[in-house]
């Protein structure tokens, strides 16, 4: 009996949430959200009074599609959706309206615009530029909005652009049409087409995805030793730029190809079977040629020889490991998972991989933080790593310190990525939960233990509202068969399933039994100023 009582006491103690950790997480999340809101307002103040659109940077007032539309504006949309709904319903929808009215040049494809009603930046239509900017807008901007918010006007904007990307794709090879000759644009297109195919099951998207993926898996890669060329010359059927870039502006093709295999395995398995061997050869060749001694990606290698061209590490190291981990999910090959784990260990040992103040950071500033932080969070979602999580907390302190008193970070479009990474980090610390309405004087932090989550609301002022929970967005927003790691996703943490039964305890009161569809309406809370509310959900 004594042993049984001791066991029960230990079990009860183990089940007690670590409220001090939840409080610490709430402070970290609260700062991330507050800083994100300040960036949003600082850039809204810089909008052109005539067009309503946002500048590229302090000394370039143009709305540049690949930058202003892709990397700045979308994350202001996401910030406003969670932190200030009147701004979301007002300014953010207004910018979308103006962008659609003023920047469409080739069907629904967008081009760069001067401020003050002066018209397009380029007097003549340059299709390669329009295709590049529009592909970036979709992949880096409209995809992440849809990942986290679901079916909004920005989703339909992406659909329109994608439809005209198919219709106007300017290049042909024997297997179909291509939007570009570059790995970046084709990789962007594959990622967009994969997710639209999951969601809509529209065969046009799937057919175009297959045409692009066939070009790489069955045509280009066998000719290059399974390293994609940065740029291919269709006229000579040979590399125009024979390097492969492991950093962004190059690595997009690998993520796109792994997404293509994941998609076709579910929707067109005979095609996925055809790509299995080329996929393995691609992933193996990348791991063989592209890692430094620590197991982290270099910047670029020569396609013909596999020799390193630029040895500096890729600051967005996690992006390529998303693809390697997806390869693990597709093949079951343990070496792919081990490569990801090895890289996570290396990042802990050398904090410069999270941000290199003397290297990549000198060129890219805060954006070098953003790409690394995002990659770490996506991988942490699949492979918990307490030491990497702690290293990320330290990196965030440096990241926060880059923001100026007026809310601006660095006066260029990369400030939008500051919002993205800060909010993604905040959701990590709150396990995907959020307070509605948002009040920066009220903090929310969480700790997780298996299927249970403990959430602590700390009110610096009286607050009344609801606690909202995340859902399985990969399934509900995209209709995906599996939640594989992918570029520009927002990781899912504690998600609420409609038909599942939950035990909910608020401030130690008698537990309530609630179904997920009830929790999805939001858990009502009222917290006096200077007090806390403790919520446990199992």
Role assignments for model-derived ranges:
Residues 1-7:
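Sec-dependent signal peptide recognition
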Residues 14-537:
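Glycan-recognition and catalytic cores of secretory/periplasmic carbohydrate-active enzymes
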């Amino acid at each position: 009996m004594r042993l049984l009582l001791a066991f029960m006491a230990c079990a009860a103690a183990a089940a007690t949430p670590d409220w001090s950790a939840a409080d610490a997480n709430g402070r970290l999340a609260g700062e991330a959200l507050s800083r994100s809101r300040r960036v949003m307002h600082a850039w809204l103040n810089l909008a052109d009074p005539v067009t309503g659109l946002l500048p590229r940077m302090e000394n370039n007032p143009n709305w540049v599609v690949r930058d202003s539309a892709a990397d700045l504006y979308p994350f202001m949309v996401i910030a406003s959706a969670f932190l200030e709904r009147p701004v979301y319903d007002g300014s953010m929808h207004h910018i979308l309206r103006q962008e659609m009215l003023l920047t469409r040049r080739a069907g629904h494809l967008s081009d760069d615009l001067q401020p003050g009603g002066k018209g397009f930046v380029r007097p003549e239509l340059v299709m390669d530029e329009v295709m590049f900017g529009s592909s970036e807008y979709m992949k880096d901007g409209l995809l992440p909005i849809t990942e986290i918010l679901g079916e909004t006007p920005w989703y339909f904007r992406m659909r329109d652009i994608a439809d005209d990307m198919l219709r106007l794709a300017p290049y042909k090879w024997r297997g179909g049409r291509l939007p570009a000759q570059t790995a970046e644009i084709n990789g962007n297109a594959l990622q967009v087409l994969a997710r639209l195919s999951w969601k809509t099951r529209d065969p046009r998207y799937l057919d175009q995805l297959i045409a692009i993926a066939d070009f790489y898996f069955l045509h280009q890669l066998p000719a290059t030793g399974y390293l994609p060329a940065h740029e291919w010359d269709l006229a000579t059927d040979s590399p125009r730029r024979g390097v492969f870039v492991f950093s962004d502006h190059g690595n997009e093709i690998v993520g796109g190809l792994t997404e293509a295999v994941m998609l076709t395995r579910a929707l067109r398995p005979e095609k996925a079977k055809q790509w299995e061997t080329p996929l393995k050869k691609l992933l193996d060749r990348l791991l063989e040629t592209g890692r430094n001694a620590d197991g982290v990606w270099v910047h670029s290698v020569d396609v013909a020889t596999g020799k390193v061209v630029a040895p500096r590490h890729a600051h967005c190291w996690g992006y390529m490991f998303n693809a390697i981990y997806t390869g693990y999910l597709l093949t079951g090959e343990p070496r792919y998972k081990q490569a990801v784990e090895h890289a996570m260990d290396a990042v802990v040992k050398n904090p410069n991989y999270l941000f290199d103040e003397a290297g990549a950071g000198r060129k890219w500033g805060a954006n070098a933080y953003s790409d690394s932080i995002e990659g770490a969070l996506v991988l942490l979602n699949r492979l918990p790593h307490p030491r990497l999580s702690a290293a990320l907390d330290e990196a965030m302190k440096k990241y926060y310190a880059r923001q100026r008193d007026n809310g601006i970070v660095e006066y260029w479009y990369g400030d939008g990525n500051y919002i993205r990474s800060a909010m993604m980090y905040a959701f990590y610390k709150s396990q995907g939960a959020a307070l509605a309405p948002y009040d920066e004087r009220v903090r929310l932090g969480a700790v997780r233990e298996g299927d249970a989550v403990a959430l602590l609301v700390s009110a610096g002022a009286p607050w009344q509202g609801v606690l909202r929970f995340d859902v399985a967005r990969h399934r509900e927003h995209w209709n995906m068969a599996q939640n594989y790691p992918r570029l520009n996703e927002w990781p899912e943490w504690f998600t609420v399933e409609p038909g599942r039964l939950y035990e909910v305890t608020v401030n130690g009161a008698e537990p309530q039994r609630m179904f997920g569809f009830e929790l999805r309406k939001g858990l009502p809370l009222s917290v006096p100023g200077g007090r806390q509310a403790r919520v446990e959900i199992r």
